[in-house]
Amino acid sequence: MRLSNGLGWVLNEMRRLEDKPCLAYNLNMTIHILKGKATVLQMQEMLVSFPDMRMVKIVVDIENEILAGGSGMHYECEQLLLEDGSKQENLWGANWFPDEQSVEFESLINIRPRQNKSIIIQDENICNEVERITRKFLGDIKP
């Protein structure tokens, strides 16, 4: 039976896919907090969440130069950094594509009433800092 509302559709899809592996979001993920260059093993573990896309969701603390990555959701990395002592206004979400060595500055955690009104980081200086720190910790690592 298909329910008419959006939630019903989600529940039906969950039942239908119950025994099938999910390729888009792997629950066996490992989130790493990096304060220095990542190892090849760390990069491989961070890629587990999105193996088909070869992408790592990251959150960068631009004040303390710390990076968390490897979750299926940016907010999980954000929460770990907040628990580690980071301040919300210094945390920015992005995606790292190791094969292309490129950064995409897009995440829901980037929406802030006073700092940024979009999921894409609008301030060029913040983008530059996120990219610099990301390349410092993840650049040139071939998993």
Question: What are these regions, as identified by a protein language model?
Answer:
Residues 25-26:
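Short, positively charged and aromatic/hydrophobic N-terminal segments
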Residues 35-80:
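Negatively charged, low-complexity tracts enriched in Asp/Glu with abundant Ser/Thr
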Residues 70-102:
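Amphipathic, interaction-prone secondary-structure segments
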Residues 124-143:
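Well-ordered alpha/beta subsegment
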